[in-house]
């Protein structure tokens, strides 16, 4: 099992496969894993063709491995929708792939909304998306600017 070379966000589709191969996985309530946020990190960089290309390739990988992820498909759908919103919020208005990402969110949002263990922020974004993706983006950008 290897992380794909040259892709951004490469841990997303691979970590789930790694967890499924483990004999035992332990969860605890402690926050023991931290991302180091650097000023030049992927998270802080503006939207680019490399981000889009990586995002599209990762979505292809996700679609190909859904059959092995059935035991955890709800959490995987939630993570996928979070990832799609993350990239969607960074895309320029009118960008051709916005519709592709929005359609993928539409296909998965009921799964996320009906999953009581799904991330609250993602469930809220899915709910608001029924009123339009522009509204979701406006609300979440406002929340981000006031650090909510």
Predicted segment positions?
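Charge-rich, low-complexity amphipathic helices
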Residues: 18-19, 40-44, 55, 84, ...
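Catalytic core of nucleotide-sugar-dependent glycosyltransferases
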Residues: 30-39, 44-70, 95-112
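Conserved nucleotide-sugar donor-binding catalytic segment
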Residues: 1-48
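Active-site catalytic microenvironments for nucleophilic, acid-base chemistry
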Residues: 21, 87-90
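Structural motif
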Residues: 68-78, 116-123
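Membrane-interface aromatic/basic loop that binds lipid-linked glycans or pyrophosphate carriers
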Residues: 93-148
């Amino acid at each position: 099992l290897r992380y794909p070379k040259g892709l951004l966000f490469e841990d997303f589709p691979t970590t789930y496969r790694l967890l499924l191969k483990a004999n035992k996985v332990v969860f605890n309530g402690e926050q023991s894993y931290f991302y180091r946020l650097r000023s030049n990190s992927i998270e802080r960089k503006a939207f680019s063709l490399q981000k889009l290309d990586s995002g599209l390739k990762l979505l292809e990988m996700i679609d190909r491995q859904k059959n092995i992820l059935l035991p955890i498909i709800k959490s995987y759908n939630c993570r996928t929708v979070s990832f799609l919103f993350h990239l969607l919020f960074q895309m320029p208005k009118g960008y051709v792939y916005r519709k592709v990402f929005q359609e993928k969110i539409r296909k998965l949002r009921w799964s996320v909304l009906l999953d009581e263990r799904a991330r609250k922020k993602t469930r809220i974004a899915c709910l608001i998306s029924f009123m339009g993706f522009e509204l979701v983006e406006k609300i979440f950008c406002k929340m981000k600017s006031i650090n909510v």
